[in-house]
């Protein structure tokens, strides 16, 4: 399995490719990592050093990869935070190049726009880029509840609201190949206190998975869930199984992180959770 992952990179900690690449490699995937930035640490610390790469830099790296003649072997493209319109455009150009070489390749887009309580935290114009250009190109989307609501204009108070919003979003996605949406964090009227729901949609079917809500809010968790879900969907061909495997692994990762009181997810220390999760969760038809 070969996955082209175009995301940010940090020297210290685990966000973007620094969160996604190691679990994917541990599970057996070859990862072709293209970094959109190289920072000392994630921006949640308030200060950092490093470089932001431009769209031309990404295009040059993609040309080099294409020159090796390997794009027909690429099974999927994974993208997350897009730092600028130029980077977003270069990522979508990369998706087009991969699909030209392998029409069966999937594009998994984590539409990083914002979050409940924080609102939109990306640059002006990027939410619209996701909505108008990335979503119509994607086979797999992994929004959180805030992003689902923003992309569709539907407020999700109940599970029925969330299902309706997901169907609206699915209609905006690519027509060729699968159309899969994973809502990575959902809290609606039916969600018990102290719990967190995840909702996945494929082929007209919805599955809900519920875990305890852990006392941790940490950068990089969304990058990990998107990468793991993509891997397991490629591996099993089934969104329900992919959700169960990815959610179980990330729960174990975050539980270990919370117990340690760490400011960074313990991607390496908790590596066994990616292979054999200590707690397994199962999704139900909803």
UniProtKB/Swiss-Prot annotation:
Annotated InterPro entries: PM/HMP-P_kinase-1, PyrdxlKinase, Pyridoxal_kinase_PdxY, Ribokinase-like
EC no. given is 2.7.1.35
EC main group? transferase
What is its cofactor?
Mg(2+)
- Reaction(s) the record says it catalyses: pyridoxal + ATP = pyridoxal 5'-phosphate + ADP + H(+)
The entry's ATP-binding residues are: 110, 147
Spell out the PANTHER family in the cross-references: PYRIDOXAL KINASE
Chain's role: Pyridoxal kinase involved in the salvage pathway of pyridoxal 5'-phosphate (PLP). Catalyzes the phosphorylation of pyridoxal to PLP.
What is the protein name stated in its UniProt record? Answer: Pyridoxal kinase PdxY
Q: Give the originating organism.
A: Granulibacter bethesdensis (strain ATCC BAA-1260 / CGDNIH1)
């Amino acid at each position: 399995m070969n996955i082209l992952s175009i995301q940010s990179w940090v020297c210290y900690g685990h966000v973007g490719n620094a969160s996604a690449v190691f679990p994917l490699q541990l599970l057996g995937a070859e990862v072709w990592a293209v970094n959109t930035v190289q920072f000392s640490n994630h921006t949640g610390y308030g200060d950092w050093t490093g470089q932001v790469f431009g769209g031309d830099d990404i295009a040059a790296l993609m040309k080099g990869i294409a020159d090796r003649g390997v794009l027909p072997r690429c099974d999927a493209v994974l993208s997350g935070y897009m730092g600028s319109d130029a980077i977003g455009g270069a990522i979508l150009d990369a998706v087009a190049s991969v699909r030209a070489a392998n029409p069966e390749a999937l594009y998994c887009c984590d539409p990083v726009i914002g979050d409940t309580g924080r609102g939109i935290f990306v640059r002006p114009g990027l939410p619209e880029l996701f909505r108008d250009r990335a979503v119509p190109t994607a086979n797999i989307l992994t929004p959180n509840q805030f992003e689902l609501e923003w992309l569709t204009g539907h407020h999700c108070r109940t599970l029925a609201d969330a299902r309706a919003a997901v169907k609206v979003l699915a209609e905006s996605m690519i027509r060729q190949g699968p159309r899969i949406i994973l809502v990575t964090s959902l809290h609606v009227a039916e969600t018990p206190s102290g719990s967190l729901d995840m909702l996945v949609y494929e082929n007209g079917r919805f599955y809900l998975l519920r875990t305890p809500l852990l006392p941790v809010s940490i950068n990089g968790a969304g990058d990990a869930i998107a990468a793991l879900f993509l891997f397991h969907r490629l591996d099993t061909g089934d969104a329900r199984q992919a959700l169960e495997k990815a959610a179980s692994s990330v729960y174990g990762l975050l539980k270990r992180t919370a117990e340690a009181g760490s400011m960074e997810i313990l991607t390496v220390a908790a590596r066994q959770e990616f292979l054999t999760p200590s707690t397994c969760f199962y999704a139900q038809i909803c």
